[in-house]
Amino acid sequence: EEYKALIHAAHDRGMRVIMDSIHNHIGDQHWWMKDLPTYDWVHNIDEYMQTNYQGSAVADPYASDYDMTKLVDGWFVPEMPDLNQDQPLLTDYLIVNTIWWIEYSGVDGIRMDSYLYPDKEYMAEWVEAVLSSYLDFNIVGEAWAVNPPAAAYWQYDLPGQGDGYDSKLPSITDFPWSFAVRDGMAEEFGWQNGLMKVYYMLGQDHLYADAMKNVIFLDNHDMSRVYEHVGKDKDAFKIAITLLMTQRGIPQVYYGTEFMFGHENRGGDDEAWRQTLPGSWSDDQRTVFEASGRTDEEQEAFEFIRGLANWRKGAIATHEGTMKHFIPENGTYVYF
């Protein structure tokens, strides 16, 4: 009921809500694990096998059956039993469960976590079932892939793909874009380094069915904060934000990035990457939800991002236009 109320309150403010979902695995404390509906409800119930985390193998024309089995059937960690989407009862349950949540809550879209790990034929069936029922709905799959060819495989109707797979998926998380921009701001300019990485990466957009539907981002809960990654260089941070708000795709800002969050270790860890916003809890000493609780640097970053985001709302070219860019020279990258 609280989730439904949140969505309705967001709608009253002209906002939309994206639900985070996952069909790859459950937690080991899920009630299913106390009495599995069928013996084959999860993979490898008798003998633990861990995934290899190599999602790019799905698009690899030379991938071995051994690697594919470990990827799809292996568990993320011992606490996350891997669901078997080849089980027809589970398939039906997951599809109906999704439709129920949309009907009940009025949620506007879904971000599907760990999209590369479940059975890919099931994922295409799930996407088609949802989008054929809700024509103005959107789904973005978390496609953690290291390069554009591996990422583009997961977007709908990729022309010329050798195995003929059509994911039906409208949007993917554009990790190659994120990696290129993060490194582009952190490295010295060179033939293959710095801003050249952004240029080379965008030059592969022809591989995507529609790169404008890619979700682009600078950091997330599984990565070091972008401000930390660029060495806490404020200018580099602002350029990265500018790229986020002016290049093709759907920009996503991870909470805390609007306040230029960093952490002590550059590599960081889950606790550092997922730190709470000051003011989220009653015993916090300050709150960033009000300008009076922010530091000068946090306020500067907030105003910079808010200004660009508000400008982007009315900048039609960033939503519908075409892009033209020039080969970077002497550390300068020009695009329109």
Go through each PLM region and give its residues.
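Bilobed periplasmic-binding protein-like "clamshell/Venus-flytrap" ligand-binding domains
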Residues: 17-20, 311-322
